[in-house]
From Swiss-Prot:
PANTHER family: ELONGATION FACTOR 2, TRANSLATION ELONGATION FACTOR-RELATED. It comes from Oryctolagus cuniculus (Rabbit). Pfam families: EFG_C, EFG_III, EFG_IV, GTP_EFTU, GTP_EFTU_D2. InterPro entries: EFG_II (IPR041095), EFG_III/V (IPR035647), EFG_V-like (IPR000640), EFTu-like_2 (IPR004161), G_TR_CS (IPR031157), P-loop_NTPase (IPR027417), Ribosomal_Su5_D2-typ_SF (IPR020568), Ribsml_uS5_D2-typ_fold_subgr (IPR014721). The gene is EEF2. This is Elongation factor 2.
Length: 857
């Protein structure tokens, strides 16, 4: 089993230049877990015979059954580079042994919050792409997240065995396929990255540099251009140059790699490389990549799969492959696996690519610090993170909770960015709502134990220095999902993670047996801990609601709740979609509300946001924490706001960060600042529970036009102003043509050409519309992209499969909010049905009349 001890790992942990923290990310079913296996078996944790079948990192029973990864799992590997390979590393290094902390993450879009949590604690990412289906929606989503977190990508083209055996591609076609995938990935990187002048420099991937791997995870073989360049350099050197020193050799190999990709051709007649596709004699020359790399692979496949015994024996001898005695008698696919695995072992190729091209914590924390840390860029904590200093103050980010074997307890899983964490150390545990100088969300407690995560096992360890990934015992009572752990008194929080999906699907749950209610509540608390994304809400009516990213996500959550967290039988409602409320025009009257004691008056109007502003707020381009003038300039330039008004934004809401704005455009009002807090509180309340059906508001700008206040402070307290502000906000919404917004999924469907018609049928029935259709070049597959309301998406997958004979594979991602056409006050319209259903579910009466909110002078 594990062939190195905890002490050995601990010794390397101090060599922070030799640590690599990386995650494996990709579209669903592109083979992350299978590839991870070949890495794990190389580092001596699975017996190599079973690699490719165990999916070691799929630790849960349901992951093994469904063949999907649900939770991201961490594992530490140890790899030693040979002296020759060390010369390829361009950053600082310390000895030949490397510690690789690898996190296998799920590819299914419903679990992309798990990916976000994994990305936060790593510095590099291995992006896996299936070379048959190419770059998909989820590849793009995850890669975009990685680049936003300043994580350096390397690419792996997986499933080459399929390209050769199923699609039967020619070498040139295969080269074009690879070329296209590399281009697609680079387009995504350059779109979302910061360019070459940014702090990370150039992070584009390029086969010539060795940042692209090719291979097959299932068969356990892989290579980068470096492997072949080394073979050829050795071959040419054998012809008479004598021995090369390691550094010269590295230089030669790098030159060779440049010749093996792109428009470079090889003339087999005289063994020379040329840049033109025709030889001096006018013969058409083969591309070097096809001739020197793909051709030998094709020959091996051809000889073995067509049972050509003599040819196979010749090739094995020529390639110098040593087979075990039991492998010699195999034929067909088993022999192919054995030969390829011996000739181009996947573990070596990938681990070399990871150690050579991904950054160590020392390199990465320099440019990631400003994204990770909220405090000033020059305090002790920030300096400790930037220099990755084990003697600095402890700064550690907990990105998620991992359930232990013992019910209801969790390991806190995270990464040490600065300092040293050890068993028994007294630390400050800061939740996401902590603000420096306040007591809220802060605990001072000792750490009970520090442990090392090993896939399905944990190993106790004394202490862990910065740059490493670690689990803590005994912190789980004080944190819900994420948080910062530090020993520095004036430390600010590490920045909260931004999820690329939002929980839009909800289910109400109740215990079948009412006596089990306390267990259900306890179970919901544990569920909220164990999943970074899920929200557990208790409605005013006493309902327990679970909100998740989609059907599959909710299904897994409910199963966990029933079996692991609450351990009781549960009844669940049908899934319900959350809506948002908005307005479509400016209020047609200036709305006035008087306070209950009739001494104060507020005048307001509401109007809709310009297109794109709500999305900017969601992304954090415009936020409450920004510098005032900078924000005003942005709004004025991009959305043509009046600069004076843009400077007087009071707040965002709901929760102080949401996509609604309260601006003050009053002129010369007395005592205005004294009631500001009360109006803001009313605004937060109103935007959280809108006028139509108490859903959140979105994309509404409220303007305070005028305020008349009583001169005596006692008559304008919070009790007078807050409800008045809320009534006034409601009135201004109801007079501004209110509308409902529904969430929309972006659906990507992969299917053969002949079933495209069936897809259109299903989408039209479900109010979806197709906006792009393209053929995947070099394959008979079509990709259809469509928008589909989340409300209609339940059972969509099953419906689609039955209409296309199971040949279409849909993938849904939450994309945007869209206005539901129709007036909520017109009884025959769709929005009015939704409003009625929602109000009935929440136990509310019908929409109150405008007169309840609007007062006469």
């Amino acid at each position: 089993m594990v062939n190195f001890t905890v002490d050995q790992i601990r010794a390397i942990m101090d060599k922070k230049a030799n640590i690599r923290n990386m995650s494996v990310i990709a579209h669903v079913d592109h083979g992350k877990s299978t590839l991870t296996d070949s890495l794990v078996c190389k580092a001596g944790i699975i017996a190599s015979a079973r690699a490719g079948e165990t999916r070691f990192t799929d630790t849960r029973k349901d992951e093994q059954e469904r063949c999907i990864t649900i939770k991201s799992t961490a594992i530490s590997l140890f790899y030693e580079l040979s002296e020759n390979d060390l010369n390829f590393i361009k950053q600082s290094k310390d000895g030949a042994g490397f510690l690789i902390n690898l996190i296998d993450s799920p590819g299914h879009v419903d679990f992309s919050s798990e990916v976000t949590a994994a990305l936060r604690v790593t510095d590099g990412a291995l992006v896996v792409v299936d070379c048959v289906s190419g770059v998909c929606v989820q590849t793009e989503t995850v890669l975009r997240q990685a680049i936003a977190e300043r994580i350096k990508p390397v690419l792996m083209m997986n499933k080459m065995d399929r390209a050769l055996l199923e699609l039967q591609l020619e070498p040139e076609e295969l080269y074009q396929t690879f070329q296209r995938i590399v281009e697609n990935v680079n387009v995504i990187i350059s779109t979302y990255g910061e360019g070459e002048s940014g702090p990370m420099g150039n992070i584009m991937i390029d086969p010539v540099l060795g940042t692209v791997g090719f291979g097959s995870g299932l068969h356990g073989w892989a290579f980068t251009l470096k492997q072949f360049a080394e073979m050829y350099v050795a071959k040419f050197a054998a012809k008479g140059e004598g021995q090369l020193g390691p550094a010269e050799r590295a230089k030669k190999v790098e030159d060779m790699m440049k010749k093996l990709w792109g428009d470079r051709y090889f003339d087999p007649a005289n063994g020379k490389f040329s840049k033109s596709a025709t030889s001096p004699e006018g013969k058409k020359l083969p591309r070097t990549f096809c001739q020197l790399i793909l051709d030998p692979i094709f020959k091996v496949f051809d000889a073995i799969m067509n049972f050509k015994k003599e040819e196979t024996a010749k090739l094995i001898e020529k390639l110098d492959i040593k087979l075990d005695s039991e492998d010699k008698d195999k034929e067909g696919k088993p022999l192919l696996k054995a030969v390829m695995r011996r000739w181009l072992p996947a573990g070596d190729a990938l681990l070399q690519m990871i150690t050579i091209h991904l950054p160590s914590p020392v390199t990465a924390q320099k440019y990631r610090c400003e994204l990770l840390y909220e405090g000033p860029p020059d305090d002790e904590a920030a300096m400790g993170i930037k220099s990755c200093d084990p003697k600095g103050p402890l700064m550690m980010y907990i990105s998620k909770m991992v359930p232990t074997s013992d019910k209801g307890r969790f390991y806190a899983f995270g990464r040490v960015f600065s300092g040293l964490v050890s068993t028994g150390l007294k630390v400050r545990i800061m939740g996401p709502n902590y603000t420096p100088g306040k007591k809220e969300d802060l605990y001072l407690k000792p750490i009970q134990r520090t442990i090392l995560m090993m896939g399905r096992y944990v190993e106790p360890i004394e202490d862990v220095p910065c740059g490493n990934i670690v689990g803590l015992v005994g912190v789980d009572q004080f944190l819900v999902k994420t948080g910062t752990i530090t020993t520095f008194e004036h430390a600010h929080n590490m920045r909260v993670m931004k999820f690329s999906v939002s929980p839009v699907v909800r289910v109400a749950v109740e215990a079948k047996n009412p006596a089990d209610l306390p267990k259900l509540v306890e179970g919901l608390k544990r569920l909220a801990k164990s999943d970074p994304m899920v929200q557990c809400i208790i409605e005013e009516s006493g309902e327990h609601i679970i909100a998740g990213a989609g059907e599959l996500h909710l299904e897994i959550c409910l199963k966990d709740l029933e079996e692991d967290h609450a351990c009781i039988p549960i009844k669940k409602s049908d899934p319900v979609v959350s809506y948002r409320e908005t307005v479509s025009e400016e209020s047609n009257v200036l709305c006035l509300s008087k306070s209950p004691n009739k001494h104060n008056r507020l005048y307001m109007k509401a109007r809709p946001f310009p297109d794109g502003l709500a999305e900017d707020i969601d992304k954090g381009e415009v936020s409450a924490r920004q510098e005032l003038k900078q924000r005003a300039r942005y709004l004025a330039e991009k959305y043509e706001w009046d600069v004076a008004e843009a400077r007087k934004i009071w707040c965002f809401g709901p929760d102080g960060t949401g996509p609604n704005i309260l601006t003050d455009i009053t002129k010369g009002v007395q005592y205005l600042n004294e009631i500001k807090d009360s109006v803001v509180a009313g605004f937060q309340w109103a935007t959280k529970e809108g006028a139509l059906c108490e859903e959140n508001m979105r994309g509404v700008r409220f303007d305070v036009h005028d305020v008349t206040l009583h001169a005596d402070a006692i008559h304008r307290g919070g009790g007078q102003i807050i409800p008045t502000a809320r009534r006034c906000l409601y009135a201004s919404v109801l007079t501004a043509q209110p509308r409902l917004m529904e969430p929309i999924y972006l659906v990507e469907i992969q299917c053969p050409e002949q079933v495209v018609g069936g897809i259109y049928g299903v989408l039209n029935r479900k109010r979806g519309h197709v906006f792009e259709e393209s053929q995947v070049a070099g394959t008979p597959m079509f990709v259809v992209k469509a928008y589909l309301p989340v409300n209609e998406s339940f059972g969509f997958t099953a419906d689609l499969r039955s209409n296309t004979g199971g040949q279409a594979f849909p993938q849904c991602v939450f994309d945007h909010w869209q206005i539901l056409p129709g007036d909520p006050f017109d009884n025959s319209s769709r929005p009015s049905q939704v409003v009625a259903e929602t109000r009935k579910r929440k136990g509310l009466k019908e929409i109150p009349a405008l007169d309840n909110f609007l007062d006469k002078l």
